[in-house]
UniProtKB/Swiss-Prot annotation:
<comment type="function">
    <text>ATPase subunit of a proteasome-like degradation complex; this subunit has chaperone activity. The binding of ATP and its subsequent hydrolysis by HslU are essential for unfolding of protein substrates subsequently hydrolyzed by HslV. HslU recognizes the N-terminal part of its protein substrates and unfolds these before they are guided to HslV for hydrolysis.</text>
</comment>
<dbReference type="GO" id="GO:0043335">
    <property type="term" value="P:protein unfolding"/>
</dbReference>
<comment type="subunit">
    <text>A double ring-shaped homohexamer of HslV is capped on each side by a ring-shaped HslU homohexamer. The assembly of the HslU/HslV complex is dependent on binding of ATP.</text>
</comment>
<keyword id="KW-0547">Nucleotide-binding</keyword>
<keyword id="KW-0143">Chaperone</keyword>
<feature type="binding site">
    <location>
        <position position="18"/>
    </location>
    <ligand>
        <name>ATP</name>
    </ligand>
</feature>
<dbReference type="InterPro" id="IPR050052">
    <property type="entry name" value="ATP-dep_Clp_protease_ClpX"/>
</dbReference>
<feature type="binding site">
    <location>
        <position position="407"/>
    </location>
    <ligand>
        <name>ATP</name>
    </ligand>
</feature>
<feature type="binding site">
    <location>
        <begin position="60"/>
        <end position="65"/>
    </location>
    <ligand>
        <name>ATP</name>
    </ligand>
</feature>
<comment type="similarity">
    <text>Belongs to the ClpX chaperone family. HslU subfamily.</text>
</comment>
<keyword id="KW-0963">Cytoplasm</keyword>
<dbReference type="InterPro" id="IPR004491">
    <property type="entry name" value="HslU"/>
</dbReference>
<keyword id="KW-0067">ATP-binding</keyword>
<dbReference type="GO" id="GO:0051603">
    <property type="term" value="P:proteolysis involved in protein catabolic process"/>
</dbReference>
<keyword id="KW-0346">Stress response</keyword>
<dbReference type="GO" id="GO:0005524">
    <property type="term" value="F:ATP binding"/>
</dbReference>
<dbReference type="Pfam" id="PF10431">
    <property type="entry name" value="ClpB_D2-small"/>
</dbReference>
């Protein structure tokens, strides 16, 4: 875990997210407390539990982005889920324990990627040797196996390879050509593992019992392989990945993945206000309280069985978020409310915020669109009054219709640049376009003035 101070964390988040200092401070403190906890004696570490955070604010103000950027910052296992996807145990749908199972899978992918980077040089060397053997195959001698069961798994005929001095000489010549990149575009045939499921998805996507059956069958039967025609460049990548997989210790990777989930895992529970049932609820609201009660043990700490082993959730940091337009945080069951002691209210965006969102972040909307059009040789320049006008229009449309926060800017900028994006490929090279207030008013004038139109178009 990176040892960032709360101030450094907020400064990093400022590069991507405008405003919302209270929310940034809350997550920065939660992150620093994790590092502080890691320095405590082992007995004390178990006692210090994370203080989960509840973010309250309208859509498009930065709730999800804060959590996502924070996880990237510390390279922690991070999972974003919508609370509305889950149903009470006994109903059709995903059960809440799949949160932990998915988090372990994400963590394992991260750990394996890191470990594969460590063995990249050895894997590349082994892949190069396999490439040479594919381009200059040795003499093969069939070795008929006496084991009848091997025929079931297409392994009845193992082939031994004999490398003669002539073949070795040819491979040396090919090796030099491979290093020079002369054969990168040549098409060859390679054997790759078949990633198709062994069983059809007869219970529906995401159903846990189906996933468990797939894993069980995968463990019983050997992996099927099939032949693919690819370029040497692509074959090198495929073979390097396969060789790296062989070099890493799978059990060690699993242990490290589980440790990271237990000690550094982060879960972002979005739309939590949608499962906050009102008193006397009926119909579709019936199972909402059940989902809350199912989430409760995971948030307060329990042991979940996964295919990689048991995972304790006591020290996973949960960040819940919701607009709470209809329901209130007090509509959540009291036990769940108590598990989110830190409440942060995110402010709605002002005109000044919109101006900053358009220009300040590292990958702001204006920079993105300018870079896209620059690929066609079109230089787009936005004047200051154009930025002011875009911010003003976004604020007005949000005020008069649904408030969707910063996402409104995507719709407006897309509308402003629609004609230019369409004609860009036909314009001459080094063409410069200046976007000013008049240009924006010309493109959006009638739509902004007519509320009925802006409801449907912006």
């Amino acid at each position: 875990m990176e040892q960032l101070t709360p101030r450094e964390t907020v400064r990093e988040l400022d590069r991507y997210i405008v405003g919302q200092n209270q929310a940034k401070r809350a997550v920065a403190i939660a992150l620093r407390n994790r590092y502080r906890r890691s320095l405590l004696p082992e007995g004390m570490q178990e006692e210090v539990l994370p203080k989960n955070i509840l973010m309250i604010g309208p859509t498009g103000v930065g709730k999800t982005e804060i959590a996502r950027r924070l996880a990237k910052l510390v390279r922690a296992p991070f999972l974003k889920v919508e609370a509305t996807k889950f149903t009470e145990v006994g109903y059709v749908g995903r059960d809440v324990e799949s949160i932990v199972r998915d988090l372990v899978e994400i963590s394992l992918r991260m750990v394996k990627a890191e470990k594969m980077e460590e063995v990249e040089i050895q894997a590349a060397q082994a892949a190069e040797k396999r490439l040479e053997a594919l381009l200059v195959p040795g003499k093969r001698q069939e070795n008929n196996s006496s084991n009848p069961f091997q025929f079931l798994f297409n392994q009845g005929q193992e082939k031994e390879e004999t490398v003669t001095p002539e073949i070795e000489r040819d491979r040396t010549f090919i090796r030099e050509r491979l290093h020079r990149g002369e054969l990168d575009e040549q098409v060859i045939e390679v054997e790759v593992e078949d990633n198709q499921p062994l069983l059809p998805d007869f219970l529906g996507t995401g159903m846990e019992i189906n996933t468990n059956l797939q894993d069980m069958m995968a463990g019983m039967l050997p992996k099927k392989r099939h032949k693919r025609k690819v370029t040497v460049r692509e074959a090198r990548r495929i073979l390097t990945t396969e060789e790296a997989q062989k070099l890493i210790d799978h059990d060690e990777a699993v242990q490290e993945a589980i440790r990271r989930v237990e000690q550094e895992g982060m879960v972002f529970l979005d739309e939590i206000d949608k499962i906050a049932g009102r008193d006397g609820a009926s119909g579709p609201d019936v199972s909402r309280g059940g989902v809350q009660r199912d989430i409760l043990p995971i948030v307060e700490g329990s042991t979940i069985n996964t295919k990689y082993g048991p995972v304790k959730t006591d020290h996973i940091l949960f960040i819940a978020a919701g607009a709470f337009h209809v329901a209130k945080p007090s509509d959540l069951i009291p036990e769940l409310q108590g598990r989110f002691p830190i409440r942060v209210e995110l402010e709605s965006l002002s005109i000044e915020d919109f101006q900053r969102i358009l220009t300040e972040p590292q990958s702001s909307l204006i920079k993105q669109y300018s870079a896209l059009l620059e690929t066609e040789g079109i230089k787009v320049e936005f004047t200051e009054n154009a930025i002011d006008e875009l911010a003003k229009v976004a604020y007005e449309v949000n005020s008069n219709t649904e408030n969707i926060g910063a996402r409104r800017l995507h719709t407006i900028v897309e509308r402003v640049l629609e004609e230019l994006s369409f004609e860009a490929s036909e314009l001459p090279e080094d063409y410069t376009v200046t976007i000013n207030r008049e240009y924006i008013q010309h493109r959006l004038g009638n739509i902004v003035r007519n509320q009925d139109l802006s409801r449907y178009i912006l």
